[in-house]
């Protein structure tokens, strides 16, 4: 009798034993009615409650638990599918490059930890369902991480590795009447774990669906469908290859929108290939995901119906032409994102509801491609991408970044796996084959990927050769060849991670033999994605650059409760696990938890839009970047807003052919009355889609112009009251008090109510973003934080009791101007000046000036910070919106009037950091529920300003590693600034904000704005 030998788990050549051959993911039904209901009686769901035992290592696992005489019915219960770490056993561990056992056990590639390597033992007692009795019986584990051994009634059935493709076994030989005992043992780390070092949380267990299944007398075990148009695209070949158990006949029907295109019958016997010609096929693309319905009815030799196989078919031609990747003859641009399969509730077991939400948000924001980083996803996503229209790079389960990193440190590349090692080759080919066989019939998949960040070598080259041979209708991708050029033909395209735009240009200038893609770019960690437009603009000017995939879609965070029982989004290290890479798991353009789009998505949507509207005061140039659809399938709307309020609307009929442009006169005349006007041209869905309702905006452009008005002078004057310690200024409804002693604006009363909670101060700091932390901004700019916190009107060089700088007071005919000079504790010492000019109507023009000190360089921000009572919790602004904007991330924003709560401006980044800023603000106000508060206006000479209203200061945010660590809210903190530096985002481990988005400190800096009570 065959037995299981645990010692083989650390052998890279032992990765399958008794496992069924991989096959396509088609579903088969007993008849047409079942197919219509999508409920197959050939399957029996094994999801649910299993008996469970947890052990820290194999030595602690219960021996011979699989035997029928060993009763496991008093074991713990566990849900399946689920990671055991999400069910209270072991803990989730997040690690990026480093292997999770590093520093705990000294092992080498192929070896496995012995001291701590959790073993999950599962038992399921069951009786074979009546309709399955007497038939061949199989079991499918759609995903078990990372190795699974299986027994039935004490008999060893088999063993399988590859955490991300199905492991299926035949049980027929060992099944019996009455109660059966199915036992499985899942090992967290096996030899193959050296090739599963992806940047994610480390889990284990049976985490995807499990089901029993039977097959009819005649059964199509594997199905390959190819629907490829010829070069003219006027006809296509439909080729179907079947691998059948038993003999019989198949009736094949291909239809489109209810009309039959093909109806035919063919004999079935073993492996068969059938082909038909389809005239004028309707082609599939992400822009217009047209699918045909294929139905295969399988009959035995007696003419009895055995099974019905429904399958969606997309006709499309993807190929390399003259060194350019083309889809249906057109140069394709990937407007993509990397997507880890992740849920804050259940780890890598993602529900259909969560998945559909992801895909809808992607489509709504013009994302047209997914890279399944860095493993095959559960099957449903491929079906939905076919339906929704999303291109896919399907990636093999391979990443050995840790071994490569060790080799980089030691310069000993023999440490790398799989590299050129023959003992790893079969495992690599098996993983490639398992993915290919399961997913091969999905139109959405354009490219097979050999894996991620595993250096290079012969083994990966052989994987690419397998894909090329198995599937000449798709291309093959692998980024790692850029680090090891020995096997440069591994990848059909040049793929790199996080190169600058200049680096891409330089590379293509030297070598344009292949098209170039960024398999990862614009690292979206925290407040990021600055200057993303430079990459997307490059796709318009450099034909060989064909787009990229943002890193990545969703924050990998897990619901956890703090010590007071309040849920928060936990990241690496929050479960007590070490080693870890902490919050590096949070790189999404969507939040963990509820999966909502983060503020970064606004910029992604604009940069990825397929229609460009270049608007002027009286016309619009419409550039249609779509490859296949005319702009006439969208409603085009034109609005004119005066000072933020829409005053006119119109529709515009457009009919711009794909990859063409047209200029249209606007249906609304240019305005002549004084004011600022925003002309917006936008495109919207005419009809409902599976991913959005009619009316959803897919693209826009905006043009701003002004009609000047004569300036109005303030007729009222002010009364000035001077004393030793204070300078008072009084008007009709307000009173201002400037403190000589405390060095600043101590009071601003409006309508009898004190408005400010603390003296406003110059501010040069922001709470560091994740990108700032990665490029050591705190070390480089730290003096500006100290300057912001400890500047003083007193000269610290004269001791703590030295005299303060007396403010300068300038009394004019109707105004008074008070100016403070602040010394800043920088090296060398520097100073700034803050002046307040008070007008008779309560307006206070505030001006901050700074004469740059060369040694100090640029600063994060240049503005003034205010504290108000937290009752002022409402914000309204006329500027860019609706989400936060920054100097290098504002192209996707529209000028308008927006409103929200102060708390809403705290973006839900996993680590508190700079957020909520508003660019190009003309005016903004913070008010209480009665409408009382403070109005801030730009100064006409300075132009629009940056505005921020948050519940916390930058220093409070910087001190918190989680949102729950932030203090109770006591204030509304307003920052008004000339600007702040951009957020950057080329990467999060050193790349700095681009030069043009830094604050210039090469000449005198000055910033003015006005505030007034409401």
Predicted regions and their residues:
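Beta-strand/loop-rich accessory regions of lumenal/periplasmic or secreted enzymes
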Residues: 85-86, 93-95, 143, 188, ...
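Accessory carbohydrate-binding/adhesion or oligomerization-edge regions at the termini
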Residues: 1-101, 185, 257, 536, ...
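Catalytic cores of secreted or luminal carbohydrate-active enzymes
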Residues: 196-220, 565-621, 625-635, 641-645, ...
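An acidic-aromatic loop/edge-strand motif
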Residues: 83-86, 91-112, 161-163, 171-236, ...
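Extended substrate-binding grooves/exosites of carbohydrate-active enzymes
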Residues: 1-38, 155, 194, 305-619, ...
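Accessory beta-strand-rich segments of carbohydrate-active enzymes
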Residues: 2-4, 8-10, 14-16, 20, ...
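Intrinsically disordered, low-complexity Pro/Gly/Ser/Thr-rich segments with frequent PxxP/GP/PP motifs
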Residues: 265-279, 644-674
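Extended acidic/polar, glycine-enriched regions
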Residues: 175-179, 241-319, 677-716
């Amino acid at each position: 009798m065959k037995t299981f030998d645990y010692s083989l788990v650390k052998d890279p050549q032992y990765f399958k034993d008794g496992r069924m051959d991989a096959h396509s993911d088609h579903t088969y039904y007993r008849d047409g009615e079942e197919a219509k209901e999508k409920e197959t009686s050939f399957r029996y769901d094994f999801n649910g409650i299993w008996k469970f035992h947890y052990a820290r290592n194999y030595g602690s696992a219960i021996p011979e638990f699989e035997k029928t005489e060993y009763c496991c019915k008093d074991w713990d219960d566990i849900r399946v599918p689920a990671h055991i770490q999400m069910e209270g056993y072991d803990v989730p561990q997040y690690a990026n490059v480093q292997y999770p056992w590093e520093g705990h056990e000294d092992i080498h590639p192929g070896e496995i930890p012995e001291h701590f390597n959790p073993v999950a033992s599962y038992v399921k007692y069951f009786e074979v369902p009546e309709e399955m009795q007497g038939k061949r019986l199989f079991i499918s584990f759609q995903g078990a991480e990372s190795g699974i051994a299986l027994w039935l009634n004490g008999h060893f059935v088999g063993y399988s590795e590859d955490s991300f493709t199905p492991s299926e076994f035949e049980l027929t030989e060992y099944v019996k009447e009455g109660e059966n005992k199915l036992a499985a043992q899942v090992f967290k780390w096996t030899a193959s774990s050296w090739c599963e070092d992806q940047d994610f949380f480390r889990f284990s267990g049976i985490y995807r669906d499990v089901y029993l299944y039977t097959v009819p007398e005649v059964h199509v075990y594997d199905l390959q469908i190819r629907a490829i148009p010829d070069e003219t695209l006027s006809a296509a070949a439909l080729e179907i290859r079947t691998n059948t158990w038993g003999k019989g006949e198949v009736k094949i029907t291909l239809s489109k929108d209810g009309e039959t295109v093909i109806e035919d019958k063919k004999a079935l016997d073993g492996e068969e290939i059938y082909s038909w010609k389809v005239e004028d096929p309707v082609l599939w693309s992400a822009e217009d995901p047209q699918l045909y319905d294929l139905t295969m009815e399988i009959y035995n030799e007696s003419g009895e119906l055995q099974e019905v196989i429904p399958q969606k078919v997309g006709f499309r031609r993807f190929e390399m032409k003259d060194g350019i990747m083309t889809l249906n003859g057109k140069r394709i641009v990937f407007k993509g994102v990397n997507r880890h399969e992740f849920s804050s509730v259940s780890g890598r077991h993602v529900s259909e509801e969560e998945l559909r939400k992801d895909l809808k948000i992607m489509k709504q924001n013009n994302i047209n491609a997914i890279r399944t980083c860095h493993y095959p996803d559960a099957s449903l996503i491929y079906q939905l991408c076919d339906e929704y229209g999303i291109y896919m790079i399907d990636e093999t389960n391979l990443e050995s970044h840790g071994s490569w990193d060790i080799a980089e440190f030691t310069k000993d590349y023999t440490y790398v796996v799989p590299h050129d090692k023959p003992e790893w080759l079969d495992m690599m080919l098996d993983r490639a084959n398992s993915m290919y066989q399961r997913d091969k019939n999905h139109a959405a998949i354009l490219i097979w990927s050999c894996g991620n960040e595993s250096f290079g070598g012969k083994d990966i080259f052989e994987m690419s050769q397998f894909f090329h041979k198995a599937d000449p209708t798709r291309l093959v991708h692998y980024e790692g060849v850029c680090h090891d050029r020995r096997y440069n033909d591994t990848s059909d395209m040049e793929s790199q991670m996080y190169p600058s735009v200049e680096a891409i240009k330089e590379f293509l200038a030297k070598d344009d033999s292949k098209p170039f893609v960024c398999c990862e770019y614009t690292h979206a960690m925290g407040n990021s994605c600055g200057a993303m437009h430079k990459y997307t603009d490059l796709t318009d000017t450099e034909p060989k650059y064909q787009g990229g995939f943002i890193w990545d879609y969703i924050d990998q965070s897990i619901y956890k409760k703090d010590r007071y029982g309040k849920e928060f989004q936990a990241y690496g290290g929050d479960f007590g696990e070490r080693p870890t890479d902490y919050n590096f798991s949070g790189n999404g353009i969507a939040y963990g938890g509820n999966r909502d789009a983060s503020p970064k998505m606004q910029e992604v949507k604009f940069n990825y839009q397929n229609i460009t509207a270049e608007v002027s005061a009286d016309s619009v140039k419409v550039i249609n970047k779509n490859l296949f659809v005319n702009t006439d399938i969208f409603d085009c709307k034109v609005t004119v807003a005066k000072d933020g309020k829409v005053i006119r609307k119109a529709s515009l009929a457009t009919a711009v052919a794909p990859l063409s442009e047209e200029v249209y006169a606007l249906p609304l005349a240019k305005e002549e009355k004084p004011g600022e006007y925003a002309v917006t041209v936008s495109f919207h869905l005419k009809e409902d889609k599976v991913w959005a309702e009619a009316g959803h905006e897919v693209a826009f452009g905006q043009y701003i112009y002004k009609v000047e008005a004569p300036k109005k002078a303030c007729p009222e004057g002010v009364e000035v009251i001077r004393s030793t310690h204070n300078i008072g200024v009084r008007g009709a409804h307000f009173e201002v008090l400037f403190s000589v002693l405390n060095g600043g604006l101590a009071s601003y009363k409006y309508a009898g109510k004190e408005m400010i909670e603390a003296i406003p101060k110059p501010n040069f700091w922001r709470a560091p973003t994740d990108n700032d932390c990665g490029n050591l901004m705190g070390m480089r700019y730290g003096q500006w934080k100290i300057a912001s916190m400890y500047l003083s009107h007193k000269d610290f060089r004269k001791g703590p009791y030295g005299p303060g700088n007396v403010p300068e007071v300038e009394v004019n005919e109707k105004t008074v101007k008070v100016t403070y000079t602040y010394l800043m504790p920088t090296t060398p010492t520097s100073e700034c000046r803050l002046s307040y000019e008070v007008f008779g109507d309560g307006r206070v023009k505030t001006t901050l000036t700074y004469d740059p000190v060369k040694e100090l360089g640029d600063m994060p921000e240049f503005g003034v910070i205010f504290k108000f009572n937290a009752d002022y919790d409402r914000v309204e602004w006329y500027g860019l919106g609706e989400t936060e904007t920054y100097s290098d991330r504002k192209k996707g924003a529209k000028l308008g009037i927006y409103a929200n709560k102060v708390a809403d401006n705290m973006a839900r980044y996993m680590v508190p950091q700079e957020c909520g800023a508003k660019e190009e603000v003309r005016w903004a106000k913070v008010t209480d529920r009665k409408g009382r508060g403070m109005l801030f206006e730009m100064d006409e000479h300075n132009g629009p300003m940056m505005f921020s209203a948050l519940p916390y200061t930058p220093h409070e945010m910087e001190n918190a590693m989680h949102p729950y660590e932030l203090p109770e809210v006591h204030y509304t903190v307003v920052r008004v600034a000339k600007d702040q530096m951009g957020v950057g985002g080329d990467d999060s481990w050193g790349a700095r904000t681009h030069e043009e988005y830094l604050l210039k400190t090469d000449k005198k800096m000055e910033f003015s704005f006005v505030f007034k009570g409401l």
